[in-house]
């Protein structure tokens, strides 16, 4: 469950290391974002000489949350940290690699590129 001011790890090689959620997209009074939701983020920590710089604002898709996601069979998939993948204006991933596992809930037409780049799909 991600809300405004939440900090997330970045699960791609775009150069950003930590980002902060500045807006949950998808409604004027939408409060929380879960796995597969798009948020607006600001880069708070980045590595030198990378594409994403500190202070840049991007769209991002949430790929892992501590809250987790409940499956129709009743099981829950949870993670230790919150993580997101940075997206460009066309909602395509900026990085060329994805770090760590992602969930099957991302298997929509919009995020198949992220699922195919991920080392593990839970």
Curated annotation (Swiss-Prot):
Q: What keywords is this UniProt entry annotated with? A: Ribonucleoprotein, Ribosomal protein, RNA-binding, rRNA-binding
Q: Decide whether keyword Magnesium is in the record.
A: no
S-S pairs: none
One example of a Gene Ontology biological process annotation: translation
Kindly indicate whether the keyword Ribosomal protein belongs to this entry: yes
Name the InterPro entries for this protein. Ribosomal_uL14, Ribosomal_uL14_bac-type, Ribosomal_uL14_CS, Ribosomal_uL14_sf
**Which residues fall in a coiled-coil region?**
none
Of the GO CC terms on this record, one is: cytosolic large ribosomal subunit
User: Molecular function (GO) terms listed?
Assistant: large ribosomal subunit rRNA binding; structural constituent of ribosome
Q: Which NCBIfam families match?
A: rplN_bact
Similarity remark: Belongs to the universal ribosomal protein uL14 family.
The record describes the protein's role as:
Binds to 23S rRNA. Forms part of two intersubunit bridges in the 70S ribosome.
Subunit (UniProt): Part of the 50S ribosomal subunit. Forms a cluster with proteins L3 and L19. In the 70S ribosome, L14 and L19 interact and together make contacts with the 16S rRNA in bridges B5 and B8.
Q: Which PANTHER family match?
A: 50S/60S RIBOSOMAL PROTEIN L14/L23, LARGE RIBOSOMAL SUBUNIT PROTEIN UL14M
UniProt-recorded name of the protein: Large ribosomal subunit protein uL14
Species of origin reads Shewanella denitrificans (strain OS217 / ATCC BAA-1090 / DSM 15013)
- What's the source species' lineage? Bacteria, Pseudomonadati, Pseudomonadota, Gammaproteobacteria, Alteromonadales
């Amino acid at each position: 469950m991600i809300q405004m001011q939440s900090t997330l790890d970045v699960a791609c090689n775009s150069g950003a290391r930590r980002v902060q959620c500045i807006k949950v997209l998808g409604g004027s009074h939408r409060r929380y974002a879960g796995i597969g939701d798009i948020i607006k983020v600001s880069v708070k920590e980045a590595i030198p000489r990378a594409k994403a710089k500190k202070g840049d604002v991007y769209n991002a898709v949430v790929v892992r949350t501590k809250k987790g996601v409940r499956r129709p069979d009743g099981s829950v998939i949870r993670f230790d940290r919150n993580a997101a993948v940075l997206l460009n204006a066309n909602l395509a991933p900026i990085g060329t690699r994805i770090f760590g596992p992602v969930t099957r809930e991302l298997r929509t037409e919009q995020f198949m590129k992220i699922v195919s780049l991920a080392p593990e799909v839970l």
